Amino acid sequence: MADPGSVGHVFRRAFSWLPAQFASQSDAPVGAPRQFRSTEHLSIEAIAAFVDGELRMNAHLRAAHHLSLCAQCAAEVDDQSRARAALRDSHPIRIPSTLLGLLSEIPRCPPEGPSKGSSGGSSQGPPDGAAAGFGDRFADGDGGNRGRQSRVRR
């Protein structure tokens, strides 16, 4: 049986041809928690999730640690926080009544899964023609629905 210490080396060498983001090039044992380098900045999604309080505790703590060391990411978090506050303080968003009416007419689909009286056929999606009729309402006269009707109608 192979020495457990050499397995990580063999694993890293076997995958050394992959880009660094896919294969770890560190000397840390395989399966060890990843240590982020100071050059790895937070992604836009991570910044938004941090500002919105949507990160899990471990991710939040890692992001907070990075923010304490990285002025660039800290500035981006400040910008995101200001944008969030500006949106919350802006006027209420109003939806046009015509759009609200169209959205309220979307047929409700039964829950997925076979019903008691079904013979094994698929009962997913709206009844035939309902989705096509809905698509017709949003077509912009010049065929703007991009061929979806041909895929919906069977």
Swiss-Prot record:
How is the protein modified post-translationally, according to the record?
Phosphorylated by PknB on Thr-39; can be dephosphorylated (at least in vitro) by PstP. Phosphorylation is the signal for subsequent degradation by the ClpC1-ClpP2 complex. Degraded following vancomycin treatment (surface stress) by a ClpC1-ClpP2 complex.
Question: Where is the protein found, in the record's own terms?
Answer: Cytoplasm
Obligatory cofactor(s): Zn(2+)
Keyword list, A-Z: Cytoplasm, Metal-binding, Phosphoprotein, Transcription, Transcription regulation, Zinc
How is the cofactor bound here? Binds 1 Zn(2+) ion per subunit.
Q: Which family does it belong to?
A: Belongs to the zinc-associated anti-sigma factor (ZAS) superfamily.
Its name, as the record gives it, is Anti-sigma-E factor RseA
